[in-house]
């Protein structure tokens, strides 16, 4: 137990300044070599503790046998060096502060005991990656003018093994199926609901205790690296959900860590999160900022993640979020100035160190400039979920078509703010739980109409400006609400109706990726032009999508009633042939097969303020795309 430390004075300086982004190399447990011998170094931050000792299966969990030594530099860090390579050993920290005694998991552990156990495990993160080709080109994959279509996945319930007690697939088993399915379906990215270690499976990963450890339910850190590696080898980007907004109050976790409110706010009005029964990080504390910044950088560095989707940003920004009693900021306002500053520093640091990735905010209010650079006063995120579009669109589609004409403005409103942020259009897990029903369950009408409505929704979504996100199961019209305890209902693909939806999503992804007009200008008003949004009586809208050059043009016409429209005239800017490249009513998608025989020649009849027009057949409950071919 010789005098040795991985932690330099400069590390302590950065830690206390709130700017350390690689604490995972310093704190926690690390196997090292000194003079040809192996040792395991442990370090934990517990500034208010009177006594800290290391307990584990190597000392029979004896609280007195391995005391740690507190550094004398005021950092509050305790350290100990043990002989031998302790990889695979379970351990915790015994912390004493006056009469308060507790066994804590390591906040920086790379691996944890399988729940319900909660000990930390000494682990090395060595892994030989095979994704160098992908990493070289990923700047293109993740860029704003590239197609980004995200498949949102919960690892524990995408697929299960019913023959073996309905067990989960492991990370490695998932790696044999998921990358190929996602590639076949044409999605560009997978977004995992949080994989960071969480004690309660029913939290879907959103109540994290291990900010540096993938959950051991599905395998080891190397197994999770293998899954990401395989996705990358198939050209699929990986976005990880990350939760810096709150953490659970489990006794072994971060809460009341050293007998004081160390990681969380001191004042209960800022500390307590009533929605989730959890604690809020103290963003004003530099060491907590260093902890969170290090966690974010860790997943991008060690796990090659392509992006972080930051959960519940609104709850961080507002001091009165879901609270009756709250503390105003120094100016008397409700904005959490410390959280705002942290989010800006987080985005600046991530983009400085990993310029090829994206940060994505789930932010449910109209907070301005979430996805604008910090130097113009924004929060600095790369993209933001468009919750307004999601709410309005699902509200509209849930209405019986006979009443849709009275809600026409709900549908058209989204374009008024569509370019105020870099938006992702999310049909996420949140829309198919808690009694909300599945996507197809929200659709009105009989069996055929439900499928036609869902096909029309997808056709409209893929044509609307913004990147795409769809939660697993939606792509084949799962009828049941999502249940994290069971697999998706893959057997539904025996039915042509569900196969049709799946084929449509695959083809929409293919068209979206192929056509620059549908993805290059997702964030630019120059790429969108209304043709007609006034036909509320028939519930028909039409618009153009264009590429950056303005030369490639696609006309999108949506008919949101089950009434076919014949000889429906739509104005277009150019003469010549317009080829039908997508029709959600096609027979292959279990539609009625109505359409425009592959395309239409423009008539020299002025319409909708344009010199030319097309006389179209609009199938019932459908969306059609026509590309100008000259």
Curated annotation (Swiss-Prot):
SUPFAM superfamilies for this protein: (Trans)glycosidases (SSF51445), E set domains (SSF81296), Glycosyl hydrolase domain (SSF51011)
Catalyzed reaction equations: Transfers a segment of a (1->4)-alpha-D-glucan chain to a primary hydroxy group in a similar glucan chain
Cysteines joined through disulfide linkages: none
Active site: 311 (nucleophile), 362 (proton donor)
GO molecular function: 1,4-alpha-glucan branching enzyme activity; cation binding; hydrolase activity, hydrolyzing O-glycosyl compounds
Enzyme Commission code(s) on record: 2.4.1.18
Highest taxon in the source lineage: Bacteria
GO terms for biological process, alphabetical: glycogen biosynthetic process
Pathway: Glycan biosynthesis; glycogen biosynthesis
GO CC terms of this entry: cytoplasm; cytosol
CDD domains from the UniProt entry: AmyAc_Glg_BE, E_set_GBE_prok_N
The entry's keywords: Carbohydrate metabolism, Glycogen biosynthesis, Glycogen metabolism, Glycosyltransferase, Transferase
Oligomeric and partner information: Monomer.
Family statement: Belongs to the glycosyl hydrolase 13 family. GlgB subfamily.
Functional summary from the UniProt entry: Catalyzes the formation of the alpha-1,6-glucosidic linkages in glycogen by scission of a 1,4-alpha-linked oligosaccharide from growing alpha-1,4-glucan chains and the subsequent attachment of the oligosaccharide to the alpha-1,6 position.
Protein name, UniProt field: 1,4-alpha-glucan branching enzyme GlgB
Organism classification: Bacteria, Pseudomonadati, Aquificota, Aquificia, Aquificales
